[in-house]
């Protein structure tokens, strides 16, 4: 089959049946795995510096989303915004304005996978960025409630594209030796947007129509993504899935192999990809989502993906992000200036926690960090509930108010340490190349639905039952803790292709906790051999 190479524009001949025509022996596989494992790697080589530049564009996709989370929570507390639209900070109208963003995201989900599969990850980021620019223009210049909601809907529509394309691109481009921290840093950039938004809101709090200024700032990150998306190398896994083997090898050599086309790590990745990625997979059929659930292994993957999509929104974090000023009000803080100041301090603390957590992903593992974080969140909510009640009933009790605020912050830090870096990357890791874009877009749909529900319900809940709303999160987080322990496998220490062995197992969690070995690589490339005992790490 002949097609145009997206990297060079030239026609290239490629094979429709990679795994059928690419045979390797047991000895060759073990030699490749051992060579890749014994090679010394550095974080500061020219190849890695180039890679960081590419990943930053992907990271900015998270910044776009983080900016909105903080900007809406911030301007919702601004008097100028409330007066302009005649709204209260916690009401059903406020919930609708927050939720319409997630509704836009949900509506975009069916289109995101096909765009990524047909035209690549770069195209997904570019298209999403364009929608965000349009939505920002509409919302920032809104003269009535309907126009503002329309802009929010378009913003949410575009964010779905970047929220899928960005983490998928980062996960597929990240160097396998440091995939944990490099992929984990993606969602940490959520807080970059959040920090900028919170402080722009604080600076504009006294200006007439000051609520528009933070919205204008949404042009920045999305504009950078649009400008630079087409200068990025395409994902090597997408290239292999479309038969562009030569281009994929060049990308891997340039960004993972110090320019060496025969680098051990390049050879290992190319071999694993050629056996795991098909040029006839369901990603070539835009309408075909069946591969997400047609086998037991795919169903195992889908359970992890969709549960992460919901858990990542319902652990208490969404309410904290969008309704932090309202939570502070429940804790006895009524001054607009102080609420916005505390809102501005919250994001930097969470950012530091999330970056710190990303450094431990490959050391501690995904499961232990997530479960430990949930235990901390449960403890925080258990303490916040009575403290907020005391502070609300006795405004003069500054000790209760300050303690309540401290534990609200501690919740954010605890959640951010694990869930912020892990949430998007775990979804990417749990999907294979054929289903990654569609699966991530389905996860984004469930995330949007879960987010819309919690955003819409949190406003009335805080208005009517106030601090008792936290009890709901205590019970739900306990359920999440048990679910993760039973059903979520560990994904560290394996390449994306090697995770197939985990999900194919009858007990994926048990298999995932077994150490990686040469046998893992043999199973990945479907080479039959007696069990190999020489472990590689």
Feature roles, as predicted:
Residues 255-268:
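Short intracellular "coupling" helices and adjacent cytoplasmic loop segments at the cytosolic face
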Residues 2-253, 278-537:
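Transmembrane-helix signature of 12-pass secondary carriers
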Residues 266-282:
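Cytosol/matrix-facing amphipathic helices and coiled-coil assembly/linker segments
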